[in-house]
């Protein structure tokens, strides 16, 4: 890889475009340590270019109608947003506690297979601005959008990061 290519790769990595396997493993361990999350079988499926993917099996998230329980859909989307913000903060070398402040969910269709969610920053959000605010104030907020594969459900939530220490 020539110098310009290596520089672009380093910039992309530092700006949170690529996953750090150790951060992903630590996030998964944190998720699994929460009894409700462990019971739901939620797993991080990957992170690339600012998008976090999360999955959960239908068989432990099924309702009386044979499709995914709405609460499970809400949980997977909320947790995918939480994990996205946590991952990107970790990639930026920041330690923070991340909380969901508020959210809105639209259920559009039943889900009859495994739950697959993707989370990304809302289009009007600027990650660099978020990091600048976080660095200056020790707290910042950012809006994340998540969706269940196929458009079955959509989530928009505001997450708050509070610096540790």
What is the predicted role of each segment?
Residues 37-39, 49, 98-102, 112-116, ...:
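Short connector loops at helix/strand junctions that flank enzyme active sites
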Residues 54, 101-103, 117, 142-144, ...:
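Hydrophobic residues positioned within well-ordered beta-strands of beta-sheet architectures
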């Amino acid at each position: 890889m020539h110098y310009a290519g290596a520089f672009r790769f380093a910039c992309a990595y530092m700006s949170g475009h690529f996953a750090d396997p150790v951060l992903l493993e630590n996030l998964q361990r944190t998720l699994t340590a929460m009894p409700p999350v462990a019971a739901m079988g939620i797993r991080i499926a990957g992170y690339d270019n600012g998008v976090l993917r999360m999955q959960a099996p239908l068989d432990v998230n099924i309702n009386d109608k044979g499709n995914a329980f709405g609460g499970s859909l809400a949980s997977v989307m909320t947790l995918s947003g939480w994990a996205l913000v946590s991952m990107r903060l970790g990639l930026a070398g920041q330690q923070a506690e991340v909380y969901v402040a508020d959210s809105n969910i639209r259920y559009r269709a039943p889900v009859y297979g495994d739950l697959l969610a993707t989370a990304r920053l809302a289009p009007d959000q600027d990650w660099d601005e978020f990091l600048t605010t976080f660095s200056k104030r020790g707290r910042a907020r950012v809006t994340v959008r998540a969706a269940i594969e196929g458009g079955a459900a959509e989530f928009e939530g505001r997450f708050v990061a509070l610096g540790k220490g």
